Structure formats: structure tokens, C-alpha cells
């Protein structure tokens, strides 16, 4: 495990950030600057991770400053971000830009890879050529990482995998920080079982991006519980690519094929849920607490939770995007030559519309929404 030996005292705190708007697709771009001056935006999350440590990524009501770099020298960090396809990714990008800012003692080289796996590999190789101090990767796909990770290791640059998981030996990277997306899928399905209480479910699933560990994890977890319910049937699943447009397009296709046959729609992020609701509204299909179709979503962004509070989304399972402060803790420990956890899970939870269930989720309230920073 690569560690840089510098003299410092480890300071750890966590950062929250206000949600920025989604950007449109564009060519991958690199930004090196104080994070607050960078406006690249970015989308979603991963498969089950071994749970060595669970870290609270931050209280939503607090916009606390990050711990900051105490080495006395600027630390150069490269972040290869998935893209900017969802509100979740936008919040995650803003969080990294805030934590790894010039004011906090960092120089952040940020690349929005626009969901292009080849561009992401190129970005990481660019970080290696720049001889940055640390590389952080939110991987677009799970496979194909061995070679470039070996190149980083040969160059003596520590690598932290963030948000999503990869299919590579853990000896090729130094740490992983993220959420347990398989558990998110299990949580969603357990909530549905409580809500239906033995009633039949005819389910349509709008999955995330093909090959993303968030897609794989949420699908695996949900299907694992669904297999225990003979009264449930998954009619179809298609990728909405974690976007609102994708969610709407898939839902329109589902309506043509299954109108009148389904009563549950599972969307693997909030943006897909917005698109699905638009499609159902156009087809005069009612949804939510007072409708004919149950909607389950993931991410629990501010807008997603507003829909949950209003009863349009029945259940929304959080995937916490505020992870940069935890990554900073790891980097500061590495820089100090201190011990650190190989794997850190970021806390998240589930929220439900008021007055429908209690056991598996937190009932949504105005106070929760008011304190939401993303």
C-alpha cells in the first residue's frame, strides 16, 4: 500500500455543499483551479462493498468546512468523475470542488468524463503523466481497470476508488470510499414487501447505466428479495442511463407494452423517476400514494425528497453524494504515514411519503427537506 510520508497532524471533518444544476453532455474537460471557481457538473453510484468502516459523510443540516491540508505544501489531487447526468452527480462534483479547494490547501485537477469509459482511462493516464500526488476515480464501468491502476502503482501514486466499485484486485488501489448499493436495493425491496403486505406486485424496472456498479448493486439487491416473493413478478427492465430523458423514454416504451398490467415502477435514480412520472402523467396513469402505481426511487436528492414528501414518490432510498470529506481523511492519513481503512462505507438511509409505512424507512418531513444540502 503506497503511503506518502509528510509530517502533519490528521484533521478530519466533512463537507456539505449546495446542489448545482445539471449540465448538458459535452466533451470531457479538465479543470485545475480552486473548486469554487469550477463549474463542471456531474451522475450516480455501485455494487456491495466489504464493510470495514462506516463513516457519516455529513449532517445534511451542516455545511461544515473540510479538515483541510495541514502538510504545509499544496497537495495535488486528480478526480476522474463519471459525468454530469444527474442531480446526484452534480452534488458529488460540487462536494469535491469545495473540499479540495485552493483555500483548503489543494490543487484539484477535475475531469468530467461524460460517461465515456475510454475518456476516463485517458484522464487517469493524464494524472499519472502530471505526477499528481493522489488520484481519485469514480469509475464509469466496473471492468478494464487493471492496466491503468498498475501504471499508477508503478508511478508511486496512491489511488482511491470512490462512489462505485471496480472488478480489479484490491492490491491495485489504496482505498475505497462509497455506499453499499446492493444494500440499497435490498432496502427498497424490503420496504415494498412491508407496504404491499402480501399483495401482488407487477414490477417494471428502469435501471441505471449498463455496466455501472450502482446499477449492478441495486439490481442484485432488489432481485434477491424479490425472489423470496412468489406474488411478485418483474415484467421488464431496461436502462434509462440515470437520466430524466432516459427514464421518460423507457417508461413510454413500457406503457405501450404493459399498460394496465403494472402497479410498481422502480427507478434506479431520481432523474429517471422524474422522466417516468412525466411519461405516466402524459398517459393519464396515476402514481404515488394516491395513485395506481407505486414509485420507488434512489438517490434521495432534494427534489426527489420533495416529490416523496408530496406523495408522488412512495419510497426514496438515499445514496449519499457527500463523500469528499471522507476521501480527504484518507488522503491526509496517507500523507501523514498514518493507518487508514482500506474500505469506508458512507452512511445513507431511506425515506417514505408521510403516513404509509414505518419499519424500513424514515417518514419524510418538512424539517428533513429544509435541512437537505443536496
Language-model segment annotations:
Residues 18-33:
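Bacterial lipoprotein signal-peptidase II cleavage site
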Residues 128-129, 133, 137-154, 222, ...:
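Hydrophobic alpha-helical
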Residues 110-112, 168-191, 205-206, 237, ...:
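Short beta-strand elements at the ligand-binding edges of bilobed clamshell
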Residues 70-73, 77, 120, 176-202, ...:
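Hydrophobic alpha-helical segments within soluble ligand-binding/sensing domains
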Residues 64-66, 73-75, 206, 210-214, ...:
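Hinge/cleft segment of the Venus flytrap/periplasmic-binding protein
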Residues 145-183, 202, 208, 301-307:
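Flexible loop/hinge segments that line or gate small-molecule binding clefts
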Residues 88-102, 106, 184-191, 213-232, ...:
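Short, solvent-exposed amphipathic alpha-helices that sit
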Residues 75-103, 108-126, 130-132, 138-142, ...:
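Extracytoplasmic "Venus flytrap"
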Amino acid at each position: 500500500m503506497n503511503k506518502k510520508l509528510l509530517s502533519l497532524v490528521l484533521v478530519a471533518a466533512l463537507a456539505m455543499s449546495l446542489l448545482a444544476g445539471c449540465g448538458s453532455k459535452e466533451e470531457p474537460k479538465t479543470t485545475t483551479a480552486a473548486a469554487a471557481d469550477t463549474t463542471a457538473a456531474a451522475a450516480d453510484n455501485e455494487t456491495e462493498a466489504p464493510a470495514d468502516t462506516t463513516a457519516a459523510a455529513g449532517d445534511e443540516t451542516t455545511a461544515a468546512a473540510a479538515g483541510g491540508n495541514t502538510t504545509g505544501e499544496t497537495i495535488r489531487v486528480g478526480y476522474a468523475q463519471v459525468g454530469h447526468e444527474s442531480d446526484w452527480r452534480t452534488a458529488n462534483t460540487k462536494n469535491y470542488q469545495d473540499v479540495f479547494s485552493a483555500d483548503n490547501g489543494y490543487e484539484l485537477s477535475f475531469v468530467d468524463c461524460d460517461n465515456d469509459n475510454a475518456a476516463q482511462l485517458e484522464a487517469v493516464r493524464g494524472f499519472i503523466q502530471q505526477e499528481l500526488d493522489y488520484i481519485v476515480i469514480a469509475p464509469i464501468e466496473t471492468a478494464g481497470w487493471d492496466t491503468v491502476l498498475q501504471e499508477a502503482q508503478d508511478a508511486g501514486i496512491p489511488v482511491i476508488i470512490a462512489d462505485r466499485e471496480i472488478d480489479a484486485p484490491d492490491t491495485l488501489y489504496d482505498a475505497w470510499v462509497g455506499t453499499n448499493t446492493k444494500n440499497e436495493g435490498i432496502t427498497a425491496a424490503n420496504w415494498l414487501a412491508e407496504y404491499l403486505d402480501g399483495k401482488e406486485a407487477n414490477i417494471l424496472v428502469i435501471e441505471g447505466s449498463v455496466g455501472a456498479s450502482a446499477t449492478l448493486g441495486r439490481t442484485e439487491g432488489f432481485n434477491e428479495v424479490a425472489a423470496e416473493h412468489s406474488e411478485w413478478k418483474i415484467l421488464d427492465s431496461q436502462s434509462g442511463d440515470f437520466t430524466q430523458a432516459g427514464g421518460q423514454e423507457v417508461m413510454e416504451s413500457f406503457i405501450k407494452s404493459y399498460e394496465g398490467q403494472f402497479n410498481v415502477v422502480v427507478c434506479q435514480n431520481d432523474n429517471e423517476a422524474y422522466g417516468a412520472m412525466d411519461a405516466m402523467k402524459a398517459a393519464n396513469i396515476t402514481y404515488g400514494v394516491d395513485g395506481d402505481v407505486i414509485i420507488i426511487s434512489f438517490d434521495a436528492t432534494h427534489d426527489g425528497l420533495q416529490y416523496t414528501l408530496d406523495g408522488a414518490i412512495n419510497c426514496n432510498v438515499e445514496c449519499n453524494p457527500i463523500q469528499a470529506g471522507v476521501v480527504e481523511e484518507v488522503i491526509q492519513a496517507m500523507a501523514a504515514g498514518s493507518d487508514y481503512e482500506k474500505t469506508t462505507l458512507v452512511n445513507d438511509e431511506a425515506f417514505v411519503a408521510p403516513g404509509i409505512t414505518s419499519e424500513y424507512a424514515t417518514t419524510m418531513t418538512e424539517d428533513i427537506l429544509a435541512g437537505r444540502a443536496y
